[in-house]
Regions:
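Nucleotide-sugar donor-binding catalytic core of glycosyltransferases
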Residues: 2-14, 121-302, 325-328
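Catalytic binding pocket for nucleotide-activated donors in carbohydrate/polymer assembly enzymes
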Residues: 5-8, 12-15, 19-24, 29-36, ...
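Short, conserved loop/helix-junction motifs that constitute active-site signature segments
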Residues: 73-75, 96-99, 148-150, 253
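Active-site proximal beta-strand in glycosyltransferases
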Residues: 73-88, 103-106, 125-128, 156
Length: 393
């Protein structure tokens, strides 16, 4: 029997990926020791080396990429396979990505193209997926009658509002010119919906001025991330996501009932019903299945890829209304499998239309669910991954 060694951490889709490997005949050993440092961690390194030497493994696997695991696999002459579920992966901007042991799969095609321009080999595009069987099993079981109102919505949104974003923390320390400039950048990104606009606005002059007031510390001497990458994604990206989510929810709630499932502070959203966070495994699919419209707002850090949330909604048979992402066009028909919006006004118009057209809305949700069940399961993704590994030998 084929055997793999897996680094386990709290990734949402970990169980789905592992159950798929098991279904395909793999014996799975796990390590789960927390990493104190993604670059150098002697205790973790010793543990991983000993584990690799203790048996014969086809490869070491992790969800998301870890440079320290890659270096150890390179040293131990064993294949390291990683499937990125975050975007962008700052940890991939590390010298270890050039290790020959790596087979790195990324769900955002733009990241794949980016690393190809760096001359990194063995980086492959692999979209995320959904475990339809698991979700259907959950949805086939009854829940308490008094729970129905918790799950049922005209419009629902599940996700963070990013109130603890780095931009708000540093805002008052920025020079007045930069505050005004970034306020304009954020507003332009929100008004146009243009992906990557905030990155292009980080000109050399702006970055030079930012260096004097933004505490950027390289995480490692082997890292090739920079101020532009970190500020665009970890700072501006999450701020734009917060503003988009707050503004959209406020506008929607002026007209319709909105159920929000989040652990974030919602004091600004006086008309929105905050139902608190939901469990990814036991509750979230029920929200998607029982909401007339499931709203997705992709964080700007995901440039072209399809976030896990879209797959999860469609896998539960839910109707998806989402901002447009380039890769959606590769797999789905807008208005047939799901519906996209281009800006706030377009979103409100489509909410109105689809709330008034139940049969069309249900038809789109059913067609989308059928498509992901046929073509976008973890079985399909892992089989494709294994074929790539076979072809690369």
């Amino acid at each position: 029997m084929a055997k793999i060694l897996v680094y386990r951490w709290k990734a949402y889709n970990y169980i789905d990926v592992m159950s798929t490997f098991a279904k395909l005949g793999y014996e799975i050993d796990e390590i789960s020791q927390p990493l104190m440092n993604y670059d150098v961690d002697e205790e973790f390194g010793e543990m991983l080396r000993n584990k690799i030497r203790s048996s014969v493994y086809d490869f070491v696997f992790s969800i998301n990429y870890f440079g320290i695991i890659s270096d150890i696999c390179q040293d131990q002459d064993i294949l390291y396979v990683a499937w990125s579920c975050d975007s962008p992966m700052i940890s991939m901007h590390h010298e270890s990505v050039y290790n020959s042991c790596n087979r790195i799969f990324v769900f955002d095609r733009s990241n794949c193209l980016e690393f190809e321009t760096y001359g990194v080999e063995n980086v492959y595009y692999l979209p995320l997926a959904v475990n339809v069987d698991r979700i259907n099993t959950l949805l086939s079981t009854a829940y308490e009658v008094n729970s129905a109102s918790f799950y049922e919505n005209d419009i629902s949104f599940v996700g963070s509002l990013y109130e603890r974003n780095n931009y708000d923390e540093i805002y008052e320390n920025l020079p007045e010119y930069l505050r005004g400039y970034f306020d304009g950048v954020i507003e332009a990104a929100l008004q146009t919906g243009e992906n990557g606009l905030h990155e292009r606005m980080l000109t050399p002059d702006v970055l030079n001025e930012l260096e004097g007031c933004f505490d950027f510390v390289q995480s490692s001497q082997r890292s090739f991330s920079n101020l532009e990458l970190v500020f665009a994604n970890n700072t501006l990206g999450f701020k734009i996501a917060r503003e988009e989510r707050i503004r959209n929810l406020i506008e929607i709630s002026k007209r319709y009932k909105v159920g929000l499932y989040t652990g974030s502070d919602t004091d600004e959203l006086i008309r929105v019903e905050n139902r608190g966070p939901v469990d990814y495994w036991k509750e979230m699919p029920r929200v998607f299945a029982n909401s007339k419209i499931n709203l997705n707002m992709t964080i700007p850090n995901i440039k072209t890829g399809i976030p896990l949330r879209v797959w999860d909604i469609m896998g539960a048979g839910g109707f998806v209304l989402t901002n447009h992402q380039l890769e959606l066009d590769m797999y789905f028909e807008d208005g047939k499998d799901l519906v996209t919006y281009s800006n706030n006004h377009d979103m409100l118009e489509k909410i109105k239309f689809y709330l008034e057209n139940d049969s069309l809305r249900n038809e789109i949700a059913a067609r989308g669910a059928d498509k992901v069940r046929k073509y976008h399961t973890y079985d399909e993704r892992i089989k494709y991954m294994l074929q790539i590994l076979k072809d690369c030998k």
